Amino acid sequence: MIQSQINRNIRLDLADAILLSKAKKDLSFAEIADGTGLAEAFVTAALLGQQALPADAARLVGAKLDLDEDSILLLQMIPLRGCIDDRIPTDPTMYRFYEMLQVYGTTLKALVHEKFGDGIISAINFKLDVKKVADPEGGERAVITLDGKYLPTKPF
């Protein structure tokens, strides 16, 4: 039976335990996701408490991380999503995403509406990918793809 969570703390505690196990075992998120049939970004989001894993994937991930049965069950429960503190992020990486939306949020909104009409980009029917590519000017660049289904606003 599908279960739901109403408290974010239990999943945040599980995420801390998962990250500790991941570090002890020297596993990457890609290695943990391997064999689940799910995208690395989706499995990572589940491990960090923002998505629910199907039972088979939760068991596979649980075995790789030596999680107990309760933790494997928690990974399958629908989490309280978007439960990051309601304040400006202080972590430098997360702050840069916040900053990007502060600078480009209105641009993204204007372009989405111009190209699609009044509506939103779904975060439910959504895919995320992060790639590291060489920068022709030296160093490396991050290519982040946000791929969400467009959902038009419908008058009623």
Swiss-Prot record:
SUPFAM superfamilies: Cyanase C-terminal domain, lambda repressor-like DNA-binding domains. Transmembrane segments: none annotated. It is an enzyme of class 4 (lyase). The active site is at residues 96, 99, 122. The keyword Lyase applies. GO terms for molecular function: cyanate hydratase activity; DNA binding. Coiled coil: none annotated. Keywords: Lyase. Belongs to the cyanase family. Homodecamer composed of five homodimers. PANTHER family: CYANATE HYDRATASE. Catalyzes the reaction of cyanate with bicarbonate to produce ammonia and carbon dioxide. This is Cyanate hydratase. The lineage of its organism: Bacteria, Pseudomonadati, Pseudomonadota, Gammaproteobacteria, Enterobacterales.
